[in-house]
Structure formats: structure tokens, C-alpha cells
Design a protein with these regions (language model features):
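Core alpha/beta nucleotide-donor-binding catalytic domains of modification enzymes
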Residues: 1-182
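AMP-forming adenylation/ATP pyrophosphatase catalytic core
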Residues: 2-29, 45-51, 80-82, 178, ...
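Solvent-exposed amphipathic alpha-helical surface segments
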Residues: 40, 71, 187, 249-253, ...
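Enrichment for repetitive, rod-forming helical segments
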Residues: 100-103, 184, 214, 293
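Flexible helical/loop "lid" subdomain adjacent to adenine-nucleotide binding pockets
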Residues: 109-261
Length: 294
């Protein structure tokens, strides 16, 4: 089993004595986060989001409240109501973000990073989607393996809550976790998650350099730009600018632009199409050398 010291060395926590908010569902990842944060000397406040989507959700909330009571720390239970159905994961994620403190730390692990990278890849994401979560200070456990975290929780004498929906094959992430990644391990004859995490870090480093080189582009709004000038840009630069602009103008943040949408938007800028439909019922059009988003 990985020692507590080795786990702490892999974490990217703020200095000991810092007051932090933790998002704690009661599952092994977030419980491991809370235990390690306290072992590191952080002053924690626990935040639990009750989606009221599972029969056991009230028990999860009571479990987290009990942890806070035993540890003598503050806890905040956020009640949200997310109805089961289509796009549940995205809607639940948006609901959590709406109520949790912006800087709340989460228990995302290296395995979550690998899964998200692959999910974004098959969704058609660009460079940003291929380096998800990297560099995010609210995700201090991205170098920690999920299995090591679960073993640590047990070794500390805790029994984490289990969410049965994490085994539901209707959710794409679960299939990526339980079917695709094990198959990739078998085909590659090695553990591929660390390789994916390493690739994500390399892509993130490239993104940072590109962002610095194109920082001035960020000041140009979608509606002020002249399409004739945009069309003269290198394709990679224009593609990056369009992706950023479309993401910024997504009203609820639940429809990040896919690669196919960005490519169609390129065609609009270059005059190859008058307009194109985007996710979320939006429409990008070109009129008199300028763009509009409806």
C-alpha cells in the first residue's frame, strides 16, 4: 500500500494552515481528499451536494455531516434537485458548480484525468479537452491513483459511501472506466492511465505557450472581428480563437464547442457557408463581414 507520506508528496495542496473548502460526496475519492487534506494540516470546511437523485442520497449527506462532527470542522450541505433522465451527468455537474464555492477542492484523481481525456477525445475535443483539469489548483490529487486513495481510506479505518450509479453502463464515463481503459491496458500490456496523464501534461504545456503567443487575440470579440482579417490568420490561430469565443458565449456552460462545430465555424468565417447551427440551439451567421450568434 502507498504510504500516507508518499500520497501527500503526490498532492498539490496549499501550505499547511490554509483554510480550504472541500467538495465531499462521501465516496472513496472525496473521503480520501478530506483525510489527506487534514493530514497535511489544512483547515477544512466540508461541502456536500445532495442531488436528491438516489434513495440513499440522504444517508450520504448524514455520513458527511457525521465526519464533520467527529472531526470538529464545519460542514455545509447544499440541496439541489436534478431529475433523472437525459444528460443527467452534465446537469448534475452544472448544479454542483452553481452551489459549491468556486475554489472548493475536489477529489479528482489521475484515473479521472485519463478517463476525461479519452471521453473528450471521442467527443471531438481540441487541445483544451485533451489536457483536462491539468493546472487546476482545485484538483490537487491528479497525480494520485484511485486505487491508492481507496486503500488509504480503508487503512485509516473508514468505510466510504458507494454510489451505485458509478456502475451504471448507461453512463459513458462508466463504460470508459470499466470497459475501455481495461481493454487498452490489455492491448498495450501496460497501465495506460499514467501515459495518458503524461500526454495531458505535455499538451497543457504546449497550450500555455500558445496562449502566451496569442494573448492579444483574447481582446477581440466575436462580434467586432472582421471576417476578412480573420480569414487571413493561420488556421490553428483562427481555430483556437473561435473555440474560445464560442465557449465564452455558451450561456450555461454545458455545451463546450466540439471540433466539428469549430470546423463549421471556420467555414462561416471564410465565406464557405452563410451560417451554421451550434449545440444549445445557437446559430453562428456571417453578415456584412461580421459574425452574429443567435
Amino acid at each position: 500500500m502507498t504510504s500516507e507520506r508518499d500520497l501527500l508528496d503526490a498532492c498539490r495542496f496549499p501550505p499547511a494552515g490554509t483554510a480550504v473548502d472541500l467538495a465531499v460526496s462521501g465516496g472513496p475519492d472525496s473521503l480520501g481528499l478530506a483525510l489527506l487534506a487534514r493530514a497535511h494540516g489544512l483547515l477544512v470546511t466540508l461541502h456536500h451536494v445532495d442531488h436528491h437523485a438516489r434513495l440513499a442520497s440522504g444517508q450520504d449527506a448524514a455520513f458527511v455531516a457525521g465526519l464533520a462532527r467527529d472531526w470538529g470542522v464545519d460542514v455545509v450541505v447544499h440541496d439541489v434537485h436534478v431529475a433523472p433522465g437525459a444528460n443527467f451527468e452534465a446537469r448534475a455537474r452544472a448544479a454542483r458548480r452553481a452551489v459549491l464555492p468556486v475554489a472548493a477542492l475536489t477529489g479528482h484523481t489521475l484515473d479521472d484525468l485519463a478517463e476525461t481525456m479519452l471521453l473528450n477525445l471521442v467527443r471531438g475535443a481540441g487541445l483544451d479537452g485533451l489536457s483536462p483539469m491539468v493546472g487546476d489548483p482545485t484538483k490537487p490529487l491528479l497525480a494520485v491513483r484511485r486505487r491508492d486513495l481507496a486503500e488509504y481510506v480503508v487503512a485509516r479505518g473508514y468505510v466510504a459511501r458507494q454510489d451505485e450509479t458509478n456502475l451504471d453502463a448507461r453512463y459513458r464515463r462508466n463504460r470508459m472506466r470499466h470497459e475501455v481503459l481495461p481493454l487498452l491496458d490489455d492491448v498495450a500490456e501496460r497501465d495506460v492511465a499514467p501515459l495518458l496523464a503524461r500526454a495531458a501534461q505535455l499538451i497543457y504545456d504546449e497550450r500555455r505557450w500558445i496562449a502566451e503567443a496569442t494573448a492579444h487575440d483574447e481582446t477581440l470579440s466575436l462580434f467586432e472581428a472582421d471576417c476578412r482579417e480573420l480569414a487571413a490568420w493561420p488556421t490553428a490561430r483562427l481555430r483556437r480563437w473561435l473555440r474560445a469565443r464560442l465557449a465564452r458565449d455558451d450561456p450555461d456552460g454545458t455545451h463546450p464547442p466540439e471540433s466539428a462545430e469549430v470546423e463549421r465555424a471556420l467555414g462561416v468565417v471564410r465565406g464557405e457557408a452563410v451560417a451554421t447551427e451550434l449545440a444549445g440551439g445557437r446559430r453562428l451567421a456571417r453578415r456584412h463581414q461580421h459574425l452574429s450568434l443567435e
